[in-house]
């Protein structure tokens, strides 16, 4: 504790608060008090009227404070709302007024009992009959309109952001409601929520760079999961027919307004279904959740009007042809495709060695930014879809889709590959691609998954939906950091 107080010379405002704390203690008042019997939330008090003649016992943080002499006004706030309070010495009593009220600061947490009345400015107000100091604020809150404007500080000190900005609290309340609504939608349709490992012995389930950790006792490296896919499909092999896992994934990649290395996804699998069923399920989830949260499926995001129902469906090759004029339905060699890429200024990485890779680059570099209304883009090339089933009519492509809304991907799904020989061949191709320098390719064959497929995976549809991006969409948040309570930040200098 001595080290704590040694720093007060450099922080005079905090030192001043501690002097108040010493004075409070001299009056026998504990500055960091015990449990208070809060009987009602402020938001519920606001539903009542003065003529009901009710007495309320509540608690909250002081957000504004003004007064002198024998009368003080303040606003206190809790999670549910804010209300004005009126404190008069003659009504409260001299001891509580002099020893508590005069020692208050903005940011203090107080408990109080009082009755409602309407001020001459027609504001519903609590007339305080008794008061208790619950927690003395030591560090001053920022000024309401000039203080917490630096977004970096808002993200680093989310607790202050939540105190100062009720709209931020509302975003995270909505996030919880969105997740709850997704769970209910799936539960109501017979899906079982399950838990799968966060630490994986073999990398797999998605194309991404992993975080690596080490288990000392077993003396093995483990990967923080990039996706729960392979474990969930093993559960389908085991006899569960509808499962989902709503949890964290980790990808050791860049940080941006759309990417956080730790993020939340719901991943689900349904036996005796295919990617068409997943399209219907995906649209149903997003439309119903949007309706429940916002009261409509028509929303505005980033200045764009969006309708979250009746999603479009288009094959990747058809969209590329529409946007660029290049027709990848025609048979061509890798060299011919590479020449087309050069002509259209599409970059091709060194590890890419197939027409399928180039088709995907055409889409990502030329088409993604043009998709505004909700659109299922389907028919991804086999080379970039190692876990998806080949299309029966054209085995160069898969029964896979990604959902794009306003230039961003929100979901990824496919008819699951259940042929163990084909799956092993795809894994082998991934290993070769990793050796050519693709850090996102799977560098090792998951033999346990191939073995699981040998027991028999029924025809299955699977899908993953990014929760953070969906929350951004449904709350209008411009950055993923606005919907993650404690986002990853760069170290301070």
From Swiss-Prot:
It holds the Pfam family tRNA_anti-codon. GO terms for cellular component: cytoplasm; cytosol. The keyword Cytoplasm applies. Its main location: cytoplasm. Its cofactor is Mg(2+). Mg(2+) 2 binds at residue 409. Keywords: Aminoacyl-tRNA synthetase, ATP-binding, Cytoplasm, Ligase, Magnesium, Metal-binding, Nucleotide-binding, Protein biosynthesis. The keyword Lyase does not apply. Belongs to the class-II aminoacyl-tRNA synthetase family. This is Lysine--tRNA ligase.
């Amino acid at each position: 504790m001595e080290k704590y107080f040694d720093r007060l010379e450099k922080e005079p405002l905090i030192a001043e608060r501690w002097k108040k704390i010493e004075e409070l203690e001299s009056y026998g008042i504990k500055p960091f008090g015990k449990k208070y019997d809060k009987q009602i939330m402020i938001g519920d008090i606001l539903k009542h009227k003065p003529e009901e003649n009710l007495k309320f016992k509540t608690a909250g943080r002081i957000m504004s404070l003004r007064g002198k002499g024998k009368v003080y006004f303040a606003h206190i706030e809790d999670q549910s709302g804010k209300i004005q309070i009126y404190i008069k010495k003659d009504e409260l009593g001299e001891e509580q007024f002099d020893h508590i009220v005069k020692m208050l600061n903005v940011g203090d947490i107080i408990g109080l009992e009082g009755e409602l009345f309407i001020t001459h400015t027609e504001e519903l107000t609590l007339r305080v009959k008794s008061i208790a100091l619950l927690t003395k604020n030591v560090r001053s809150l920022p000024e309401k309109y000039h203080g917490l404007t630096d977004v970096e500080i808002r993200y680093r000190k989310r607790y202050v952001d939540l105190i100062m900005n009720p709209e931020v609290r509302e975003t995270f309340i909505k996030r919880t409601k969105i997740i709850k609504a997704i769970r209910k939608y799936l539960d109501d349709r017979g899906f079982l929520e399950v838990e799968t490992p966060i630490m994986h012995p073999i990398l797999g389930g998605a194309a991404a760079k992993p975080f690596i950790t080490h288990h000392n006792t077993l003396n093995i490296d483990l990967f923080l999961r990039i996706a729960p896919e392979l474990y969930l499909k093993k559960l389908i092999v085991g006899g569960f027919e509808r499962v989902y896992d709503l949890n964290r994934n980790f990808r050791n990649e860049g940080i941006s307004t759309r990417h956080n290395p730790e993020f939340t996804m719901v991943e689900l699998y349904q036996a005796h279904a295919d990617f068409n069923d997943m399209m219907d399920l995906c649209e149903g989830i997003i439309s119903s959740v949007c309706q429940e949260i916002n009261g409509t499926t028509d929303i505005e995001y980033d200045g764009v009007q969006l309708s979250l129902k009746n999603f479009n469906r288009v094959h990747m090759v058809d969209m590329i042809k529409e946007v660029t004029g290049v027709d990848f339905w025609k048979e061509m060699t890798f060299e011919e495709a590479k020449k087309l890429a050069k002509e259209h200024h599409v970059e091709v990485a060194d590890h890419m060695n197939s027409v399928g890779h180039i088709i995907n680059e055409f889409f990502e570099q030329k088409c993604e930014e043009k998709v505004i209304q909700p659109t299922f883009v389907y028919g991804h090339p086999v080379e970039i879809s190692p876990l998806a089933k080949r299309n029966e009519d054209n085995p160069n492509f898969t029964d896979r889709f990604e959902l794009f809304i306003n230039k961003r991907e929100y979901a990824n799904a496919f008819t699951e590959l259940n042929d163990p020989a084909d799956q092993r061949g795809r894994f082998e191709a991934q290993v070769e691609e990793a050796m050519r320098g693709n850090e996102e390719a799977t560098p090792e064959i998951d033999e346990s998954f191939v073995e699981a497929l040998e027991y028999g995976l029924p025809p299955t549809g699977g899908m993953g939906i990014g929760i953070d991006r969906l929350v951004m969409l449904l709350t209008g948040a411009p950055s993923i950091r606005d919907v993650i309570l404690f986002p990853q930040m760069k170290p301070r200098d």
